[in-house]
Amino acid sequence: MANSFISKGVKAAYDAYYQAHDEQWRLLGARYKAQHIVHVSKSHTFKKVLEVGAGDGSILYYLDQWKFAPELHALEISKSGVAHIEAKNIPSLQSVQEFDGYHIPFPDDSFDMIILAHVLEHVEHERLLLRELKRVAKYLLIEVPKDYRFGVDTRMKHFLDYGHINMYTPTSLRFLVQSEGFRIVADECSLIHPEVSRFNAFINQKKSPSFFAKFKIELEYRLKSLLGMLGGKKQEEKWANAYTVLCSKQHDLEIF
């Protein structure tokens, strides 16, 4: 696939993004994402794992610490991201490469699993990427934020500022991957943990860490957890902040 599939503006934005790096914040978020990966794939063992869109390598850092797989690899579209990954000196990381966003520089069935964590919402041509990932790995694990809400189109600037150009619900993501010939193996919904919310509010946004503000964060988390637990799968998906799904490749895309 040609480099032209990824817009020059998108490439430049991510180069700049990782240059303005906040390691403490990214490590905190990555710890919970890595926990989701481990939990959803707990019934499987993987020897050779590739993370596509590996960012600064924070997820791989935790997966290495937890002995998730003996051999890890990373692909990232930004030079600054690659530099951050290399600087972490992750023991089980066998290779780090910059790539064009769509072409995976490995032969067919090279990996037991590919991880795509909080990447798909940024991808301009999502189906092209999914087909390439299916070529290279037996399993694919995707995590996306559940950004879609009623009136999401009125908040375009908010989401575009984060680079989120695709909106997903658990249902819409399942439809996407199954229509591309993947089989759903395991999945889970998750909420933003209060630890992450507190850091974002009081460190990133520099809000006052008042008792009321802390209580509100904790109450919202517990209330959403309770509603999801009591209301079944539909309510769990309604209140979720993120969705993680493990897929295996099954067949090629079939239309008509």
Predicted regions located by residue number:
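A short beta-strand submotif of the Rossmann-like class I SAM-dependent methyltransferase core
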Residues: 113-119
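Short aromatic-enriched loop/helix-cap "lid" or pocket-rim segments at secondary-structure transitions
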Residues: 87, 152-156, 196-202
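Short alpha-helix
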Residues: 165-181, 187
